[in-house]
Amino acid sequence: SPIGTPPLSVLSHGKQNILVITSDHTRSMPSGITMPILLEEIRKGQPDASITILVATGLHRPTTQEELLDRFGPDIVARERIVVHNAFQPEEMRYVCQLPSGAGLSVNRLALESDLIISEGFIEPHFFAGFSGGRKSILPGICSQETVNENHSAKAIASPLATTGVLHGNPIHEDM
């Protein structure tokens, strides 16, 4: 049961376009176990929902079909709509706003076309963003090359507050 929020079956009720953002091949995540549970809970609340699994690659290379099979298993790969994010396709990005740093935030259009966005992943210490987890699924996970490059710039990383476990004043975290 979730803490401090309604269950996914309640959150998904009445939502048609649901996006589940998940980590790519560079992150250890037991999606073969967790994704079926997430999908079942979503469909309890909205059986006919159109669900897209978006693999958050950031600037990493695309996740291969073999890696998708290893991560999710053959049933999910065969049955579900899975899209591998590509930050280098500007036609797939949409501008959202200006970030506190002054950089522009452009994200994968699928996020803006969704009624509900769910992020699957771990939260753990991160050496310059403070911590990994939910917000990193968005930035850098599903952002444009330009947005990620600004967020991960030498200037931002050089900040003494851009370090493990620090969120307050961390310029990388504050843009996320």
What are these regions (language model features)?
Residues 27-47:
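Histidine-anchored nucleotide/phosphate-binding helix
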Residues 3-6, 37-40, 100-110, 174:
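Short alpha-helical segments and helix-capping/turn motifs at coil-helix boundaries
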Residues 138-176:
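Extended, low-polarity segments enriched in aliphatic/aromatic residues
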Residues 63-132:
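An acidic, phosphate/nucleotide-engaging active-site surface
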Residues 17-28, 52-58:
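Short glycine-rich or small-residue beta-strand-to-loop segments that form or flank ligand, phosphate
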Residues 3-19, 43-49:
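Glycine-rich phosphate/diphosphate-binding loops that line cofactor/substrate pockets in enzymes
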Residues 14-17, 47-51, 77-79, 112-116, ...:
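Short coil/turn connectors at secondary-structure junctions
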Residues 41, 127-148:
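A short, gly/pro- and small-residue-rich
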